[in-house]
Amino acid sequence: VLMFNQTYVAKDPAVGELLRNRDFRIALSYAIDREKIKELAFLGLGEPRQGVPAPNHPYYPGDEWAYKYTEHDPDKANEMLDSIGLTERDEEGFRLLPNGERLDLEISVVPAFANWTDVGQIVVENWADVGIRAHVEIRERALHFQMRNTNDLMIEIWNEDTTGFPFSGQPK
């Protein structure tokens, strides 16, 4: 599951504002080719959906929420990114922040989970297709958690407990 840090302000408050923008997150969701991730990173196993409790769980929110924003639709992603004002691009086609700097998102992964790096790389490629520059940062687990606790992660890939466990390791 990609987890966007909606309280991020560490290096660039403008990036933090985007991470808190619902339409920005939805646009990036539409840009992701989950079928490709399933085939290449998970050997064709699994089902692309949101990180919600499993269908047999009493807190399953229903199929509408489980599959919301999961279709791969780069055109819709581009339209949404344009609609929130990310229309300016650099010479390589990457979108620019309002200050003219290139938007560059960091996805943090822990190497203990080998396929997470692969997932991150596919997401980076998908986002590049809609003009969003991103990169995967592979970190040792202790550093990853330290950065999570100090609010220094932009985006992370972490597992989702689909049993509906009521507590989370995410800072609130």
Q: Which residues does each predicted region cover?
A:
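Extracytoplasmic/periplasmic ligand-capture domains
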Residues: 1-43, 47, 52, 57-172
